[in-house]
Amino acid sequence: MLRCRPEPLMPRATRVAVAVSLPLSHAVIPTQLPSHPGHRPSGRPRRCPKAPCLPSPVGLSSTQPAKRVTMGWPRPGQALVAVKALLVLSVLQVPAQAVVRAMLEDISSSVDFADLPALFGVPLAPEGIRGYLMEVKPANACHPVEAPRLGNRSLGAIALIRRYDCTFDLKVLNAQRAGFEAAIVHNVHSDDLVSMTHVSEDLRGQIAIPSVFVGEAASQDLRVILGCDKSAHVLLLPDDPPCRDLDCHPVLTVSWALGRTLALVVSTLFVLNRLWLWAQACCSHRRLVKTSTCQKAQVRTFTRRNDLCAICLDEYEEGDQLKILPCSHTYHCKCIDPWFSQAPRRSCPVCKQSVAGTEDSFDSTTDSFSDEDPSLPGHRPPIWAIQARLRSRRLELLGRASPHCHCSTTSLEAEDTTVSPAPPEAPGQ
């Protein structure tokens, strides 16, 4: 009896489609099919496949060992591997247009038979070639074969030819001359697929029908289907044409969707990062400006001990030119300048600290506070400017102290040496 077994995996090229419609009561095929060594015992009859034994999507294979048909509970490891394989195939699977459909007891089923198209003759049309499969006589088609007997059938005939004994181009040409619309050449004692090539250019130019090559197991399965119903027909389809629609490639569709999502997320994160850096830079700049402003606007405590000149005892007024010595004592320029010009030692009148090293700088620059607002926060004129302004008033103060005396240079120098740290007093006191 016929057993349902998976067909061994083979390279996919074109495919053969078979459609069969069988009644419920089918007996053993009366004719004995030729047996092959190593496949099954000689003389063992074959039966038509019943409904519970429908061909699998992989294909029928009458040459597989019987032990592979044994049904049982799969092992946990095998079940896990099968689940993973189904998941991978569900993602990588591309819709196939070449199928084999076997109709048994109102149950539809399809089987794919792997084949390779010939390198000569016309290629298969995109819609394929449909016809009734018939074995030629002689089986190798090395000689002229009998014409197909179609009767009133609407479809043409497709020849099933055995390999060897002559060239492929001669076999196909003999089938064409007999009236077949296509040819299927099957292997012998092997399921390997070979590419059929021509030998004679003359024969190649005469071939006008397509042809394909299949393995021996596929040919035996086709014979079983033909023996079950004489009205069974086959469909030869070319390789699946490249689908230009993105929906035909699930992997590309998923990759495209994930890529767009990833690009959107990355661009959003990039924009947010740039905005965050910009906000941080603005805050840092504001803090820096505020800090620098506070540093420039230093607060100075006003003390009453620095609001008058120690020489003339007059209070400082706005617009007065002041001179601050390195010892931080402040004088009017008109008061301290005569002191420095007459004294043998250039020193502070109060603390006697020498200022000879800075006298050149006092003479070099004189500035005025009239253009500046001393009430501004942090306003502090340079020391050298204040010191330079105190020089011009010395002679005037000395002249005011002794208006009736003619002050010579010698007397002024002698007077400078007697000045105490306290402010000088008038001669009449």
From Swiss-Prot:
Residues 272-429 are cytoplasmic. Residues 28-250 are lumenal. One of its GO terms (biological process) is protein ubiquitination. The keyword Ribonucleoprotein does not apply. Keywords: Endoplasmic reticulum, Glycoprotein, Membrane, Metal-binding, Signal, Transferase, Transmembrane, Transmembrane helix, Zinc, Zinc-finger. It is a single-pass type I membrane protein. Its main location: endoplasmic reticulum. Its EC number is 2.3.2.27. It catalyses: S-ubiquitinyl-[E2 ubiquitin-conjugating enzyme]-L-cysteine + [acceptor protein]-L-lysine = [E2 ubiquitin-conjugating enzyme]-L-cysteine + N(6)-ubiquitinyl-[acceptor protein]-L-lysine. Residues 152-223 form the PA domain. Pathway: Protein modification; protein ubiquitination. Gene3D superfamilies: 3.50.30.30, Zinc/RING finger domain, C3HC4 (zinc finger) (3.30.40.10). Residues 1-27 form the signal peptide. The RING-type zinc finger is involved in CANX ubiquitination and degradation, but is not required for interaction with CANX. This is E3 ubiquitin-protein ligase ZNRF4. It comes from Macaca fascicularis. The gene is ZNRF4.
